[in-house]
Design a protein with these regions (language model features):
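Outer-membrane pore/translocation modules
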Residues: 118-234, 275-276
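Residues on the lipid-exposed face of transmembrane beta-strands in outer-membrane beta-barrel proteins
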Residues: 66-68, 95-99, 142-148, 172, ...
Length: 344
């Protein structure tokens, strides 16, 4: 449940109603504040860096992931606006599930993610210090990935004997408006809209090295209940590129160096175009460490390389993963007819 820190804080309080009364100032300030809101819609975002997204796995592989992601830093805004010294901190606890299956002879992976977030935003509006805290569910996510080239559906036994070369895959991800959202608050954990991310990528192994590249686009639905509950918000697509170079020390133990660049995402409010066009890049690293045959840890860090507008965040995450393999269903045994012979 949302927790407000006293009077005069951000979201559904007297200070924002006063801003609403001063419409010209609100119109100039709101696009920046929308950028802050969008910081908590991470999953379909082009900002995420995911090495080995299109790695092959045997059919029947299942996994569960428990992860903690923390992001904190400043939010860069148009200096002409009366909003300064904005700092945001967001910790997300994630439960994820995944299953690899055979889709028309190709390897396919379906995943689902349920995030719970704790967010804190501070800053100065018109020279007055403001702060807001939120705690609750963020928007749930699901993604389907299919390997089109180099991703034949294989059993664990077949997979162990196969040669794994270049892989080309595609994915479609969906973010559902299941997160905590209050129209009377400007800053929310949920977005009150649907979002879709389409991505295609290539993975090329060379000995212990792996080289990956991908391109994607995020598409966003409209929010007809934007603050203070009577405004229409739409957002243009965000296009992004990713690149990863990883090195495998031994099976399931590897390190990757990651980079991403993304652009777009301008927000329109009631048909008025905002000045919040993004063109940013990030760099990071990921390390995977096996604990047992079926358990592993993954550590990741990233930081802003160039930030034109929006969140200039440092992010750190740690994830625990457990893997198990399902069994193929055994065909039912049909009892022979009396007499032991085949039926005529």
């Amino acid at each position: 449940m949302a927790k407000m820190l006293g009077a005069g804080r951000w979201g559904g309080c007297r200070s924002w109603h006063n801003l609403r009364a001063r419409r010209p100032q609100l119109r100039r300030t709101t696009p920046v504040l929308v950028a802050i809101v969008l910081l908590f819609a991470a999953a379909a975002s082009a900002q995420e860096m995911e090495p080995r997204t299109f790695s092959p796995s045997p059919v029947g592989t299942n996994f569960v992931v428990f992860a903690v992601n923390h992001a904190s830093g400043s939010v860069l805004v148009d200096p002409s606006l009366p909003v300064t010294d904005i700092h945001a901190s967001n910790t997300v606890n994630v439960l994820g599930l995944g299953h690899v299956f055979d889709l028309f002879g190709r390897q396919a992976l379906i995943t689902g993610v349920l995030p719970y977030a704790n967010a804190d935003v501070t800053g100065n509006v018109g020279g007055n210090a403001r702060e807001v805290q939120r705690s609750g569910l963020a928007d749930a996510q699901a993604k389907l990935s299919v390997l089109l080239l180099g991703g034949k559906a294989l059993t664990p036994g077949e997979f162990a004997q196969a040669h794994h070369g270049m892989v080309i895959g595609v994915s479609v991800g969906v973010m559902a408006p299941t997160g905590q959202y209050y129209p009377q608050y400007l800053i929310n954990l949920g977005t009150n809209r649907w979002a879709t991310r389409l991505e295609g990528g290539i993975s090329i192994p060379r000995g212990r090295w792996m080289f990956e590249g991908s391109a994607g686009v995020g598409l966003y639905g409209d929010n007809d209940l934007f603050y203070p509950g009577e405004r229409h918000k739409s957002q243009q697509s965000i296009k992004g590129l990713q690149g990863h170079v990883s090195y495998t020390f031994r099976p399931r133990m590897w390190v990757a160096f990651d980079g991403t660049w993304y652009t777009g995402g301008r927000v329109d409010l009631d048909g008025v175009r905002g000045a919040d066009f993004q063109r940013n890049s990030r760099l990071g690293a990921t390390f995977a460490l096996p604990l047992t045959r079926r358990q592993s840890l993954k550590f990741a860090y990233s930081t802003g390389a160039t930030t034109r507008l929006g969140g200039d965040f440092d992010t750190f995450s740690v994830a625990y993963q457990m893997v198990w393999f399902g069994k193929r269903p055994t065909p039912p045994q049909v009892a022979p007819p009396p007499g032991g012979g085949l039926p005529h």
